[in-house]
């Protein structure tokens, strides 16, 4: 439960309802501090929790379930899905999330969603999971209504978005940096990843992918995005009889 406790403590928006009638909800740290006797630990807790931050807690194996695509870099796919969902984009299809993000950057996303619901009688959020199949024509109607052009032109837009979408570690790090830039000064984004060891298994490529994600994220955000990882099983045990270079890879993450 340590990972969950840390995620709650470090998230500036998290509140715990009081069991006492009439009392306002409190931050988890406000409940914990009166029970901490060590003054140094108390000071460290106050300092850490005073930093504005958002916690993203997820089980990596569960979060991976449902993602579409080639799965050439499954670790990266999950890490990209999480901030997409945080911002209200569709996490299971990267090209749809990228399309939504691009509209949002131009200040057109909310207007498009309103047009979609008015034209089709259904919400965009409920329909977008079937965009590649049954709702493509519904998308075309709404897109043509909002931006002009024909419905065939609209279908070409979303097809081109799918064909041109490429997921990269640099793109992911850039998106996180962009999100942080929209937040108050000093704001941090913390990824709390549960069961990473089980998901990595004996696949060295996943281990290296995780290492690169962590390093790129820290570099792009000047340390304002941090990755916390837990595993019920020891990572060395999961990897089995690793070769020397694999053990070296592992040490870079630990």
Task: Kindly give the residue locations of the regions a language model identified.
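Beta-sheet entry/capping signal
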Residues: 1, 54-57, 187-191, 224-229, ...
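Substrate-engagement module of ASCE P-loop NTPases
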Residues: 12, 175-182, 209-226, 249-253
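P-loop NTPase motor core
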Residues: 2-129, 254
């Amino acid at each position: 439960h340590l990972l969950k406790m840390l995620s709650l403590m470090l998230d500036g928006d998290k509140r715990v309802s009081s069991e006492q009638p009439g009392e306002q909800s409190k931050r988890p740290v406000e409940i914990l501090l009166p029970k901490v006797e060590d003054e140094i630990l108390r000071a460290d807790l106050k300092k850490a929790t005073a930093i504005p931050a958002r916690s993203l807690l997820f089980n990596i194996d569960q979060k991976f379930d449902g993602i579409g695509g080639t799965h050439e870099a499954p670790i990266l796919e999950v890490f990209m899905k999480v901030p997409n969902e945080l911002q209200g984009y569709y996490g299971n299809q990267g090209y749809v999330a990228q399309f939504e993000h691009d509209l949002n950057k131009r200040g057109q996303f909310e207007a498009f969603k309103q047009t979609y619901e008015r034209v089709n009688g259904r919400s965009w959020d409920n329909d977008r999971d079937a965009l590649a199949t049954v709702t493509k024509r519904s998308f075309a109607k709404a897109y043509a209504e909002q931006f002009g052009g024909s419905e065939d032109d609209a279908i070409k837009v979303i097809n081109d978005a799918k064909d041109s979408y490429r997921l990269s570690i640099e793109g992911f790090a850039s998106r996180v940096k962009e999100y942080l830039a929209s937040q108050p000064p000093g704001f941090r984004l913390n990824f709390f990843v549960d069961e990473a060891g089980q998901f990595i298994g004996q696949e060295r490529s996943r281990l290296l992918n995780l290492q690169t994600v962590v390093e790129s994220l820290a570099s792009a955000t000047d340390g304002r995005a941090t990755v916390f990882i837990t595993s019920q099983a020891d990572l060395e045990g999961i990897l089995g009889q690793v070769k020397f270079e694999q053990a070296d890879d592992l040490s870079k993450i630990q």
